[in-house]
Amino acid sequence: MVLARLIFQATIYPIWLDKTEASDISKLATQFGTLRLIDEAISGKLASYTSYEHLQLEALIAWFHHLQPKFENNLNENTSKSALSSEFCKVGACLLLTLPEDVFSVISHFLSPSDICDIIFCCKSLCALVDSEKTWLVQYEVVKVVKPLVGIWVQKNPVIGISYPLLDAG
């Protein structure tokens, strides 16, 4: 578990990656339920990005899905959303904030639209990254939904705070 915590610190990635075999990455991924994602990255499906970026992206997804239930289970009526957000994003935000927009848009096709929106709820400072046109274009391609339907979904969920210029343009 200590190793897992270290891996989630952005400064350890280059050192850890140089000394880690693909099989070890897969073992770690199994622990966090993201084996398929790691395997896809290692097999070169995202070949235009470096191994460092692959690992960073996969760790982000692992972090997101691993910690989310923990914090949801610990919620009570006295827990404020802002307290949850600051605790929830302590480690993961630094990973997301270091991602180039292009890289996040590629990896976002692994995430469901609700996961992407959950990232917005968890850390308002990440809104600009998640709200990028490229991220939602990837979702449009993956989900294969016509633009008007995506626009209706966005309009019916104003609390999410998503503005999607391509939808506004018609």
Curated annotation (Swiss-Prot):
Can you tell which superkingdom this protein's organism belongs to? Answer: Eukaryota
Name any one Pfam family assigned in the record: F-box
Domain named F-box is located at 93-139
Which range is the signal sequence, renumbered to this chain? Answer: none
- Name recorded for this polypeptide: Putative F-box protein At5g39470
Q: Name its species.
A: Arabidopsis thaliana (Mouse-ear cress)
Taxonomy-wise, where does this protein's organism fall, top ranks first? Eukaryota, Viridiplantae, Streptophyta, Embryophyta, Tracheophyta
